[in-house]
Amino acid sequence: MFAFKKAQRLLKKNDFDFVFESAKKITTDDFIFLFRENKLGYARLGLALSKKMIAKAHDRNRIKRLLRESFRHTNLPAVDIIILARPGLAKKTNLGINTKLNKTWEKLASCYGK
């Protein structure tokens, strides 16, 4: 069974603060990706999808599932990543979101030469 392992998640405030204090940024129409290299040897993901940006819980949950699954299938360098949602994301289709994510993962990987 495939899973998004606990080790691949940013869970604690210190983990999020580590990224926020000196993050690099990639901005798209739908997302803001904040990322910072870590010393763990694998990538970790944190999600910050607020009610203000995505009002309905089922939309937030759908988008979180898409983000986690896309992250899980992507081979990334050792970075901690926080994804912030932008307004209007809930109106996008799953295919549109996945297409945008794949382009962004490639851009992020190219920042670290992987």
Curated annotation (Swiss-Prot):
It catalyses: Endonucleolytic cleavage of RNA, removing 5'-extranucleotides from tRNA precursor. GO terms for cellular component: ribonuclease P complex. GO terms for molecular function: 3'-tRNA processing endoribonuclease activity; ribonuclease P activity; tRNA binding. Its EC number is 3.1.26.5. Keywords: Endonuclease, Hydrolase, Nuclease, RNA-binding, tRNA processing. SUPFAM superfamilies: Ribosomal protein S5 domain 2-like. InterPro entries: Ribosomal_Su5_D2-typ_SF, Ribsml_uS5_D2-typ_fold_subgr, RNase_P, RNase_P_CS. It comes from the Bacteria. One of its GO terms (biological process) is tRNA 5'-leader removal. PANTHER family: RIBONUCLEASE P PROTEIN COMPONENT. Consists of a catalytic RNA component (M1 or rnpB) and a protein subunit. Belongs to the RnpA family. RNaseP catalyzes the removal of the 5'-leader sequence from pre-tRNA to produce the mature 5'-terminus. It can also cleave other RNA substrates such as 4.5S RNA. The protein component plays an auxiliary but essential role in vivo by binding to the 5'-leader sequence and broadening the substrate specificity of the ribozyme. This is Ribonuclease P protein component. It comes from Legionella pneumophila (strain Corby).
